[in-house]
């Protein structure tokens, strides 16, 4: 475990997992596209709401995770994924400039297209190790989530697309947990 301003991220098999709500473990461990899983689970069809899609400076922790030197900008994308009425997932993606070269150019302006749909469609994508966290009230990541993300579980991993890695962080929101209880 390492501590930083963002969150305390643990390897996915850390003992803290014993506190993960029932049913959420399968979502945290999803090895493939979370988008595909959402498409199967969200009633009425999956909707993507774009919150942010711009160039900017990732947090120090995020920059380290994608091996971006201090002060360099990356493409930052924040979206809500869920039904028309309720968000189930808040996702934040950090895309270094190298990830947007060549075939990756289309990732720079996805709009309402889910990242998973664009990445996993007929392409070879490798996922790095998954890390999990439970967001605290002072985590800047929790503050980015509309309505607040304190107490929510999150996962993050590096997705390798060609020679460059993206950092994808996904926060599991209360409506998803409610759907698991139904």
Swiss-Prot record:
GO terms for cellular component: cytosol. Its main location: cytoplasm. It catalyses: chorismate = 4-hydroxybenzoate + pyruvate. It is found in: Cytoplasm. Keywords: Cytoplasm, Lyase, Pyruvate, Ubiquinone biosynthesis. Its EC number is 4.1.3.40. SUPFAM superfamilies: Chorismate lyase-like. It holds the Pfam family Chor_lyase. It is an enzyme of class 4 (lyase). One of its GO terms (molecular function) is chorismate lyase activity. Substrate binds at residues 77, 115, 170. Removes the pyruvyl group from chorismate, with concomitant aromatization of the ring, to provide 4-hydroxybenzoate (4HB) for the ubiquinone pathway. Belongs to the UbiC family. This is Probable chorismate pyruvate-lyase. It comes from Alkalilimnicola ehrlichii (strain ATCC BAA-1101 / DSM 17681 / MLHE-1).
């Amino acid at each position: 475990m390492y501590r930083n301003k963002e969150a305390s991220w643990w390897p996915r098999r850390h003992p803290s997992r014993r506190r993960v709500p029932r049913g959420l473990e399968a979502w945290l461990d999803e090895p493939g596209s979370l988008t595909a899983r959402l498409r199967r689970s969200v009633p009425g069809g999956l909707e993507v709401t774009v919150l942010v899609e711009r160039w900017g400076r990732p947090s120090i922790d995020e920059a380290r995770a994608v091996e971006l030197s201090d002060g360099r900008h990356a493409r930052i994308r924040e979206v809500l994924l869920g039904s028309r009425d309720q968000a189930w997932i808040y996702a934040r993606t950090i895309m270094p400039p190298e990830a947007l070269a060549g075939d990756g150019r289309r990732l720079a302006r996805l709009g309402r297209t889910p990242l998973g749909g664009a990445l996993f469609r007929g392409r070879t994508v490798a996922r790095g190790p998954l890390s999990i966290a439970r967001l605290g009230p002072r985590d800047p990541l929790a503050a980015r989530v509309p309505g607040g993300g304190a107490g929510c579980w999150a996962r993050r991993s590096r997705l390798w697309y060609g020679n460059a890695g993206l950092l994808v962080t996904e926060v599991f929101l209360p409506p998803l947990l409610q759907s698991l209880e139904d």
